[in-house]
Structures are given as structure tokens and as C-alpha cells.
């Protein structure tokens, strides 16, 4: 019997408001433990919450960008459970009347467009953070308690780990573009829980659902789903039954492990939050927010293709991140070869960001500095290969490219007489390659060029090197 997977995702995104959802404490990441707190977010007796209007506005922005219906009337609810990181022993969330519902995003997998439904988006407060350090017990940092979140719940419309990966990538891009969240998984401002079950192909009945946690990257989501789908199919094929539970992804072992039995919604004993009035979003306010939405990724991609002549692949990669798209456009306005800019962003820039785990706004290279580097190549001051060395130094130190070139003596050798002497020496030292070239073996020319580059430590002007080599070899 063949099986298929059914996948749904719950994404928690911290909102980029300056203050918390029900008090004026800062939402800034970091800080000494328990310094961004007050009686309200600590849930002390006698305190009352006041809903931050910006939280509602940002949630509506996200909802509109994700094609949702925005409720004119919604309310907050208490979700009751006990855990040390929850100071009030309940979380203020939304239950039966979410702010946004019935949305969708379109993803592209294997050249086909698929619509993934968004069941609901609701607002809620974050909990604190447990710290398991070398002490007799665990510590709690409540700095994060009360930070505003939106929870985006998809429909179970995904059937492969790749679709889940593409959905998350698209969702992150939209949240960044709308400036609703910075989506930094390493700081916990974007968190993903995955629900997955399997069923016989063709069946409409859902299988037993497993929730996966401890997913700290989109690739981890993909790998965990790949493993979990295989595990569930194996259990069923061996005549077993799937137990509804929450499982943790173990990155080191590449497996999922049981955590606890999955709670049902009624275990939380939801009831309306008595200390907050209902949320009213008028049509006028909704329209005002809609008009303030920025250019979305798909529109920017179309514009980059038509305005800057980028190939579709380049435009898709560049516009997947708002920060990278903005960086590209600043460069393209100052430099007349947008394709060269995109090559650098997708090549060296991307490689070093991946190696260091940094985002483009966290590195010291500005658009103006990259343009200067590209102009140094165009003007023959340095070669393309030397430019990569210069760029690494720029990336690490923030120094201007011309300063690095001067300090390290990296200027190209463009003096014809000087270069001719080096080439004559290379020809004299490699008679076999010279003979091969004269016998029609073009690869020999590449070898000789490589020897010239080696002798000059990559500083020979490539065009001049080829020209002089051909002249000398024709003698």
C-alpha cells in the first residue's frame, strides 16, 4: 500500500513593536535576565493589561499580505495551563474569534504553483524562557514574557517536506517585506511547529497527527519531516498504530524522539479574557493599513526583471529577502551592470553570510563599497579573482576596497614590458605546454595563463596576459 503525507504548520512570529503587547516594557532582544519586566508582564496581583494598538495593526498588515479576511470583531481569550515560564498560569491569546482567517500563499515546487491555505492568524503574548544551566535547578528569564506574537496556522495542504520548506520561505519573505517581524530564528523571533500524519494514497480520512518541535531552521523542518514520514509509514506497514504525541527533532542523531502526549484544545480551558474589551477593526482602518503595504516580493521580482534586465532565477533569489533586494537596488542605482551585482550577491556575498551566519544588514559592507569594488575590476585596477580576496577582507574588517588594495599591494600588473618579461620566463620554463599549444591543444594556453597568474600571485591583467602570450607563442 502506498502512503502520502499530510502536513500543516504553525508559525509563531514575534512582532516588531517597540513595546510589549499589554505593557510599556521594551521588546528588545537580549539584556540581562529579568530586566525588561514590570508588574503587568510578570502577572502580579492587581495589574491590568492594556492592548497595544500597534500589535493589532501589524497583525492586520500580515493578514492582508497573506490574503486573509480581517474580522471586524474579535476578542482575546485566556489559555490556561501551568508552566514555570508562564507567570500568570495562563496565556492571553485568541480562540474562537481570530483576527484573520481564510488566507493563502502560493508556492512554486517543480515548476508548478500550489496554493497553501492559511486557516487563521491570531495574536497572543509570548511566554518567558527557561534556562537550564549548571545549577541545582532551572532558571526563568521573563524578558520575553508579554512580547507580542502572531500565530499563523496553515491548512493541512502540504504533502511533501519540500512544499513545507517553500511555504516557510515564502511566509518569511512576506513577513519581512511587510516589516511585521524580523524573522530571526536564531533569536527566537520565528518559531515553527509541524503537524504531520500519513494516510493511504487516495484516502480522504486524516491519519493520527504528530506534532514536531525543536525545529531551529527551515532545513531542520524539512529533515524532521522526511524522517517522521518514513517512521510513520514503517510503523503502519509493520501492523502498528501511530500514537498521537509531540516529538522532538534530534539534529545530532537525525531522528525524532517522543516528548509528551499531545494535548487537545479543551485541555486549555479557554474562556474570554475579562480584563480586555473586544477588538474592533473598522473597514476604514483596514483600508488605511492596506494602502500602507509595501511592494510585495512577486511584484518586486517582476520589476527587477523588466527594469534591471535580471534573469528570472536571479530576480527570484534576490527578492526572496527584502534586505538583499534593497541592497541590490541601492547598488543598481549607482552601477550600470545589475547582473554583475546579482552575481556577487548570489556568489561571494551569499557564501560568506552562510559561513558566518550573518544577515546582510549585519555585515560591514555597504552597497557603495560593493560598487567601488566592481568599478576597481572594470577599471583594470584588480582582477576578478583578486577582487574575491579583497571582498573577504572588506567583509571581515569593513575597510574600503581601495584601502585594502593599496595596503596589500594587490593592484594588477598592467605594465606591458613588466608582464612580457614574466611571460617569457613562463614560456621558457614550460616547453612541453608550448609544444602542445603549437600542436593545436587549446588547453595548454589555459595552463600557461595559470602559470603566469601563479608567478604574479593573481595580479596579472588577464586580457593583457592572453594578448602577450599569443604574441610570444606565435614567434
Swiss-Prot record:
Catalytic activity: L-glutamyl-tRNA(Gln) + L-glutamine + ATP + H2O = L-glutaminyl-tRNA(Gln) + L-glutamate + ADP + phosphate + H(+); L-aspartyl-tRNA(Asn) + L-glutamine + ATP + H2O = L-asparaginyl-tRNA(Asn) + L-glutamate + ADP + phosphate + 2 H(+)
Enzyme Commission number(s) of this protein: 6.3.5.-
InterPro entries: Asn/Gln-tRNA_amidoTrfase_suB/E (IPR017959), Asn/Gln-tRNA_Trfase_suB/E_cat (IPR006075), Asn/Gln_amidotransferase (IPR018027), Asn/Gln_tRNA_amidoTrase-B-like (IPR003789), GatB (IPR004413), GatB_C_1 (IPR042114), GatB_Yqey_C_2 (IPR023168), Gln-tRNA_amidoTrfase_suB_CS (IPR017958)
Record's keyword annotation contains Transcription: no
Alphabetized GO MF terms: asparaginyl-tRNA synthase (glutamine-hydrolyzing) activity; ATP binding; glutaminyl-tRNA synthase (glutamine-hydrolyzing) activity
UniProtKB keywords: ATP-binding, Ligase, Nucleotide-binding, Protein biosynthesis
Biological processes per GO annotation: glutaminyl-tRNAGln biosynthesis via transamidation; translation
Catalytic EC class: ligase
Assembly and interaction partners: Heterotrimer of A, B and C subunits.
Similarity comment: family membership: Belongs to the GatB/GatE family. GatB subfamily.
Classification via NCBIfam families: gatB, PRK05477.1-2, PRK05477.1-4, PRK05477.1-5
Function: Allows the formation of correctly charged Asn-tRNA(Asn) or Gln-tRNA(Gln) through the transamidation of misacylated Asp-tRNA(Asn) or Glu-tRNA(Gln) in organisms which lack either or both of asparaginyl-tRNA or glutaminyl-tRNA synthetases. The reaction takes place in the presence of glutamine and ATP through an activated phospho-Asp-tRNA(Asn) or phospho-Glu-tRNA(Gln).
Protein name: Aspartyl/glutamyl-tRNA(Asn/Gln) amidotransferase subunit B
Organism: Thermoanaerobacter pseudethanolicus (strain ATCC 33223 / 39E) (Clostridium thermohydrosulfuricum)
Classification of source organism: Bacteria, Bacillati, Bacillota, Clostridia, Thermoanaerobacterales
Amino acid at each position: 500500500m502506498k502512503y502520502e503525507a499530510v502536513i500543516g504548520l504553525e508559525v509563531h512570529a514575534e512582532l516588531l513593536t517597540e513595546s510589549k503587547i499589554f505593557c510599556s516594557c521594551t521588546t528588545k532582544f537580549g539584556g540581562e535576565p529579568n530586566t525588561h519586566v514590570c508588574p503587568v508582564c510578570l502577572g502580579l496581583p492587581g495589574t491590568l493589561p492594556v492592548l497595544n494598538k500597534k500589535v493589532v495593526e501589524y497583525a492586520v498588515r500580515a493578514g492582508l499580505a497573506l490574503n486573509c479576511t480581517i474580522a471586524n470583531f474579535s476578542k482575546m481569550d485566556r489559555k490556561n495551563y501551568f508552566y514555570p515560564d508562564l507567570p500568570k498560569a495562563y496565556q492571553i491569546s485568541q480562540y474562537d474569534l481570530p483576527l484573520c482567517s481564510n488566507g493563502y500563499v502560493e508556492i512554486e515546487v517543480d515548476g508548478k504553483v500550489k496554493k497553501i491555505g492559511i486557516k487563521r492568524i491570531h495574536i497572543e503574548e509570548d511566554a518567558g524562557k527557561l534556562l537550564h544551566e549548571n545549577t541545582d535547578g532551572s532558571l526563568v528569564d521573563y524578558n520575553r514574557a508579554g512580547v507580542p506574537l502572531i500565530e499563523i496556522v496553515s491548512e493541512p495542504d502540504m504533502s511533501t517536506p519540500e512544499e513545507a520548506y517553500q511555504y516557510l520561505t515564502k511566509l518569511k519573505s512576506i513577513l519581512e517585506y511587510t516589516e511585521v517581524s524580523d524573522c530571526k530564528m536564531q533569536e527566537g523571533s520565528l518559531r515553527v511547529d509541524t503537524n504531520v500524519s500519513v494516510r493511504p494514497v487516495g484516502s480522504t480520512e486524516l491519519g493520527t497527527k504528530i506534532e514536531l518541535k525543536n525545529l531551529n531552521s527551515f532545513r531542520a523542518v524539512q529533515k524532521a519531516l522526511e524522517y517522521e514520514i518514513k517512521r510513520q509509514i514503517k510503523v503502519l506497514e509493520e501492523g502498528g498504530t501511530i500514537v498521537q504525541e509531540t516529538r522532538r527533532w534530534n539534529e545530532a542523531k537525525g531522528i525524532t524522539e517522543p516528548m509528551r502526549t499531545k494535548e487537545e484544545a479543551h485541555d486549555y480551558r479557554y474562556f474570554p479574557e475579562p480584563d480586555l474589551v473586544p477588538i474592533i477593526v473598522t473597514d476604514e482602518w483596514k483600508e488605511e493599513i492596506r494602502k500602507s503595504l509595501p511592494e510585495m516580493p512577486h511584484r518586486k521580482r517582476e520589476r527587477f526583471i523588466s527594469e534591471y534586465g535580471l534573469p528570472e532565477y536571479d530576480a527570484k533569489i534576490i527578492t526572496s529577502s527584502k534586505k538583499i533586494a534593497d541592497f541590490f537596488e541601492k547598488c543598481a542605482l549607482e552601477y550600470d551592470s545589475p547582473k554583475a551585482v546579482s552575481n556577487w550577491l548570489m556568489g561571494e556575498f551569499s557564501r560568506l553570510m552562510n559561513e558566518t551566519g550573518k544577515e546582510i544588514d549585519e555585515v560591514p559592507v555597504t552597497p557603495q563599497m560593493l560598487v567601488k569594488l566592481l568599478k576597481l575590476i572594470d577599471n583594470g585596477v584588480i582582477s576578478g579573482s583578486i577582487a574575491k580576496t579583497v571582498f573577504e577582507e572588506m567583509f571581515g574588517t569593513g575597510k574600503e576596497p581601495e584601502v585594502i588594495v593599496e595596503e596589500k599591494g594587490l593592484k594588477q600588473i598592467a605594465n606591458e614590458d613588466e608582464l612580457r618579461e614574466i611571460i617569457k620566463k613562463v614560456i621558457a620554463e614550460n616547453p612541453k605546454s608550448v609544444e602542445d599549444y603549437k600542436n593545436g591543444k587549446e588547453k595548454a594556453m589555459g595552463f600557461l595563463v595559470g602559470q603566469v597568474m601563479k608567478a604574479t600571485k593573481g595580479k596579472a591583467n588577464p586580457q593583457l596576459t592572453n594578448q602577450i602570450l599569443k604574441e610570444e607563442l606565435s614567434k
